[in-house]
Design a protein with these regions (language model features):
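Cys-dependent protein tyrosine phosphatase-like superfamily
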Residues: 1-106, 119-172
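Conserved SAM/SAH-binding loop-helix junction
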Residues: 116
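Short cysteine clusters
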Residues: 110
Length: 172
């Protein structure tokens, strides 16, 4: 994968049509009211997988065109999904969506694009690419180096998040 093929600076390519990174409005106070949404849309993102809770950051769904989807899968900051099965259900939903819309481009994000995002991306590799726990974590971390945030933050952020990825691998 080309290291420069990514929608915004603090993002990275996960697979051919899947990208991950910070919240679209992460730098809202430094840029326009719409943050990085115009750049993400120009890049061709058609599905946003939002891992934040509703009270964490400003809502951005109203800035999206009607043909762009936002899927909410809230996870508390620095925490893990409610269950392995809930992530399996999410991935089955994404699998169906990608089957119906093969040209869809998915953008996975939490707030900073590190802990929760890294956890879901590692699980993505286990589910969609059939990688082992170690392979998935290694690949996620390699891809994450495309984001400047990787210079000062590890992904996933917590031991609990890493253990969730291990549990996901054991149950997949």
């Amino acid at each position: 994968m080309n290291k420069m093929y990514k929608p915004i600076e603090y993002s990275y390519q996960v697979s051919r049509n899947v990208f991950a990174g910070e919240h679209p409005l992460f730098d809202i106070y430094k840029s326009s009211i719409k943050g990085n949404i115009p750049a993400l849309l120009k890049f061709g993102i058609t599905v946003f997988l939002d891992l934040t809770q509703s009270y964490e950051v400003p809502e951005y769904a109203s800035f999206l065109p009607s043909d762009v989807q936002r899927i909410s899968f809230p996870i508390r900051n620095c925490d893990v999904p409610s269950s392995v099965e809930s992530v399996m259900d999410l991935f089955r939903r994404l699998e169906q969506l990608m089957h119906e819309q093969p040209q869809a481009k998915l953008y996975i994000h939490c707030h900073g694009g590190v802990g929760r995002t890294g956890t879901i991306v590692a699980c993505y590799y286990i589910y969609f690419e059939h990688l082992s726990f170690e392979e998935a974590l290694d690949k996620m971390r390699r891809q994450y180096t495309q984001s400047p945030r990787s210079k000062f933050m590890n992904a996933p952020e917590t031991k609990r998040q890493i253990e969730f990825v291990r549990r996901f691998a054991e149950n997949n």
